[in-house]
Amino acid sequence: MLIFALITILPCLLVGPAAFAGGAWAFWPVIYMTLLVTVMDRLIAANTDNADPEAEFPASEALLIGLGLAHFCVLATAIWGVAGPSGLNLAERVALGAGAGLIFGQISHPVAHELIHKQTPVMRWQGQWMYTTLLAGHHVSAHLLIHHIHVGSDKDPNSAPRGENFYRYMARVTRQSFLTAMTLETQRSIRAEKPITRHPFILYIGGGLATLIAVCMALGGIGVLAFLSIALHAQIQILMSDYVQHYGLRRARLANGRLEPVGPHHSWNAPDAFSSFLMVNAPRHSDHHVSTHRDYPALQLDPEEMPMLPYPLPIMGVIALVPKLWFGLMNPLCDA
């Protein structure tokens, strides 16, 4: 657990001096999340070791909660540094915003994802608020009610079919995911005869508006612009993770007309050690779908049975931004 803690906490700590001291400090979060992660993935051997799948990790939840609390501190600090009277010059503000966005997309997102799968209501609530403060609260319902049930099929908006580039995917999923999740939550509320105030989308939309209002009151219009830019950066990475990890993989239809059960061959995985620790083992994605409630340190990786990405997950996200390059690399792997 110590390695998870060190690799995830350090970039969060760097945001403080980046915002308050500026200078070279302003560039360290983005350097850590790009150059350092890439270099360390190259230097450290791929990690295919597996912990005991039945083992318990008492410290794992404490780290999630701590990183969840850090998310809100990092968000407030980054917005102030980018849009407030921090004394940073334009380049430093841009670098800080970019670094913070990467932290939210590659640390906050995997942490919030783990939290919304927990059985403890407080932990699920924390994960919901993490997504909500990135204006992506609907992802909670879409992920739990749609993605995990229909992954690898046309009913899951977040499972990209072969040949769909990321930009078309992003435009489609942004609309479909929100509307489908809201419809399902409304139907659940009606069946359960819950008052409208308990509709999850009241939290997602209301919480997002409250965050916007708080930023506006504190830092004005420039603060809102900075917040929206950082949130959009994080949202793109949230969508990118699903795009990369499920691109072109489809569940077969059985003789009885039903889809085959979700298996280890329905997600792309990456064995690269440093970025996997950074993202609390999110690149071990197949096992998460097969064993949804397995603690992240115990997620299994089997390169013989699970589809493997040719490069680390963050690098694959960059490649996906160039459709021709992405298709040339991934379509043959999908066909194989």
Model features per residue range: what roles?
Residues L43-E56, R250:
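Membrane-helix interface/capping segments
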Residues A51-T174:
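Intramembrane catalytic core of multi-pass membrane enzymes that act on lipidic substrates
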Residues M1-G16, T120-M123, G127-Q128, T132-F201, ...:
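Cytosolic/stromal cytosol-facing helical appendages immediately following the last transmembrane segment
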Residues M1-I44, A59-A83, A91-G105, T197-M240, ...:
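Alpha-helical bilayer-embedded segments of polytopic membrane proteins, i.e.
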